[in-house]
Design a protein with these regions (language model features):
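Charge-rich, low-complexity N-terminal segments
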Residues: 1-133
Length: 133
């Protein structure tokens, strides 16, 4: 498969509801992460790959990156309860609406330390929408 990729970063705020009452997560020991239940800030780092069908700027890098950045505006992202995986899923649906029938891979990382890498087949948004309905 042939693809291009772009990167960008956005400041965002999110939280992990219920983490403070889940005994697997609110342990009171070295592995306690109950603090994640409070709104907290990250720099979310995105890397987005998209399938292209030829080698002469099928999708131009800079235009694709600028379009992705504009999706999120200039303010910090208010993500509420969304995980990196949920952020990637939402972005994949939006990308496939503009660029249908293309394989997409999205990496979303918190502070470039921890994150996810998600792969979406060329019909992901159709399947995702059918699951929601």
């Amino acid at each position: 498969m042939r693809s291009i990729w772009v990167t960008f970063s956005k400041e965002g705020i999110h939280k992990y509801p219920g983490v403070d009452t889940d005994p697997k997560l609110a342990t009171g020991n070295w592995d306690d992460v109950s603090f994640l239940g409070y709104s907290h800030r990250h720099i979310f780092h995105f890397k987005v790959w998209i399938e292209v069908f030829h080698d002469d700027r099928d999708i131009e890098f800079i235009q694709f990156k600028r379009w992705l950045e504009r999706l999120y505006g200039n303010d910090e992202l208010q993500l509420d309860h969304k995980s990196c995986e949920m952020i990637a899923d939402d972005l994949a649906v939006t990308i496939q609406e503009k660029y249908p029938n293309r394989y997409i891979k999205i990496s979303v990382a918190e502070d470039n330390e921890n994150g996810c890498e998600m792969e979406y087949p060329d019909n992901y948004s159709d399947n995702f929408i059918n699951q929601v309905i």
